[in-house]
């Protein structure tokens, strides 16, 4: 919260019981280590931690009060305490209440791949005209989403909120907090398919929960080239973005410039935009087209939209280019992976004009019964792309090595692969590093930088 709230207001918002009143709270923190004077401390509970153990510390450091699902033995004087059944759920209710104080364009983004990229692109565009709040990094779960909403200030004129999920009901739950005026789905793929009936129809159903909280008069923005999203017939204004002729926001004249990015033309009902996208990958056209669609819908000028797309910057380990001595380049895309995203980035690597192209690939998780086949399919794709070297790491990557041919190595762990990585990362090599987040391939990037 950046607008001061009383303990009684907070208690009413979360449906809690005010055990003891105190001063006004000005901010929310879930980490006792970064408490500022006047904070509301929300002690979260996880498998290996319980924030209730740090309530006294947080209050003594200056927090105005706290939520608590466990009754404290002693109530410190001058501090407010609000009893709730579940602190995480209460945090979500507080965020939903606080969001209601802001009558601004609220963009909610979900999809199987490209959520963070699209969120960053939309924020880059909208920031050319509005003071825009965006989700930091990919804090897109039941804790990150309310924390983002609680960062809203009076000065904000728009917000772009990224929401992820791996089970049914999660997008719906976050949607009750966000209550979007614009709902965006980037695509439907196999990410977390093992938890979603094992089918892409299940993934579509889960992602479509975003529309349940779309506000009256709201806008849906979809990937118009996605076969499953193309089946949706929604009862509100919808803009489809892509290369297909039936798209409302159509991309043409695509010119890929390797790792330096690409250019394209985006045409809407009102205008035509010549765009320069400063990040590699053909998939970037969808984020750019969605930026055009939403920017135009919200009244941005043509110049603001073009400038915003050009201002896009990748975040974290997402298509981050690292230039190393000896004309070596690392394409750091190791934050996460699913079959569609891995295939796209491998095609990008294959099109790179470098003497040597190398891929370091790790397991893709949450694929359920499709896991083995998905890794085998990546191996078959590698045969088409004819890269000079592939290093596969992890249990599931064994299936890739059963179908891939050529200069292909397999290791069970990152540590086992280090010697080969150093040897193969020769001058003039462009290397792609990609795996699911749990593989911790940031270690690979560090090793390659040492080389």
Predicted stretch roles:
Residues 1-93, 350-354, 380-394, 398, ...:
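N-terminal leader/targeting and accessory segments in enzymes
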Residues 10, 39, 58, 94, ...:
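Residue-level signal for inorganic ion chemistry
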Residues 12, 90-224, 228-237, 423, ...:
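Phosphate-binding loop of NTP-binding sites
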Residues 19-28, 89-92, 140-143, 163-168, ...:
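Short gly/ser/thr-rich secondary-structure transition/capping motifs
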Residues 46-49, 314-317, 334-406, 410, ...:
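Active-site beta-alpha connecting loops in nucleotide-dependent enzymes
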Residues 72-77, 184-329, 354-355, 380-384, ...:
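Acidic, Mg2+-coordinating active-site environments of NTP-dependent enzymes
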Residues 109, 316-320, 438-446:
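ATP-dependent carboxylate/acyl-activation modules
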Residues 418-424:
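Short amphipathic alpha-helix with an adjacent loop that forms part of the alpha/beta core around
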């Amino acid at each position: 919260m950046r607008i001061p709230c009383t303990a009684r207001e907070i208690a009413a918002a979360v449906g809690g019981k005010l055990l003891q009143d105190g001063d006004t709270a000005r901010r929310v923190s879930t980490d006792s280590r970064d408490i500022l004077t006047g904070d509301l401390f929300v002690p979260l509970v996880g498998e290996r931690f319980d924030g209730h153990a740090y309530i006294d510390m947080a209050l003594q450091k200056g927090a105005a009060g706290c939520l608590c699902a466990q009754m404290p033995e002693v109530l410190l004087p001058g501090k407010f305490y609000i009893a709730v059944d579940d602190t995480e759920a209460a945090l979500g209710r507080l965020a939903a209440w606080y969001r209601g104080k802001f009558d601004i364009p609220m963009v909610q983004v979900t999809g199987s791949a490209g959520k963070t990229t699209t969120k960053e692109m939309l924020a880059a565009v909208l920031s050319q005209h509005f003071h825009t709040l965006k989700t930091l990094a990919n804090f897109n779960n039941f804790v990150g989403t309310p924390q983002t909403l609680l960062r809203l200030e009076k000065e904000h004129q728009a917000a772009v909120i990224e929401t992820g999920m791996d089970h049914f009901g999660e997008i719906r739950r976050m949607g009750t907090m966000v209550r979007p005026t614009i709902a965006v789905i980037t695509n439907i793929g196999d990410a977390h398919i093992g938890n979603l009936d094992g089918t892409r129809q299940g993934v579509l159903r889960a992602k479509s929960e975003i529309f349940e909280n779309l506000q009256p008069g709201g806008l849906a923005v979809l990937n118009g080239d996605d076969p499953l999203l193309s089946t949706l017939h929604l009862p509100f204004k919808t803009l489809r973005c892509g290369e297909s002729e039936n798209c409302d926001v159509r991309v043409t004249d695509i010119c890929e410039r390797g790792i330096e990015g690409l250019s394209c033309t985006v045409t809407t009902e009102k205008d035509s935009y010549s765009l320069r996208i400063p990040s590699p990958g053909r998939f970037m056209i969808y984020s750019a087209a969605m930026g055009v669609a939403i920017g135009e819908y919200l009244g941005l000028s043509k110049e603001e939209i073009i400038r915003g797309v050009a201002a896009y910057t990748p975040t974290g380990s997402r298509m981050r280019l690292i230039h190393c001595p000896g004309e070596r380049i690392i394409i750091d895309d190791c934050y996460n992976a699913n079959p569609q995203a891995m295939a796209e980035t491998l095609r990008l690597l294959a099109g790179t004009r470098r003497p040597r192209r190398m891929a370091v690939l790790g397991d893709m998780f949450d694929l359920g019964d499709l896991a083995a086949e998905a890794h085998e399919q990546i191996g078959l794709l590698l045969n088409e792309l004819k890269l000079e070297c592939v290093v596969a790491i992890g249990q599931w990557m064994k299936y890739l090595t059963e179908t891939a041919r050529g200069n292909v190595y397999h290791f069970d762990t990152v540590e086992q692969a280090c010697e080969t990585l150093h040897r193969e990362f020769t001058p003039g090599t462009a290397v792609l590093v990609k795996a699911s987040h749990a593989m911790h391939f940031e270690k690979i990037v560090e090793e390659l930088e040492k080389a």
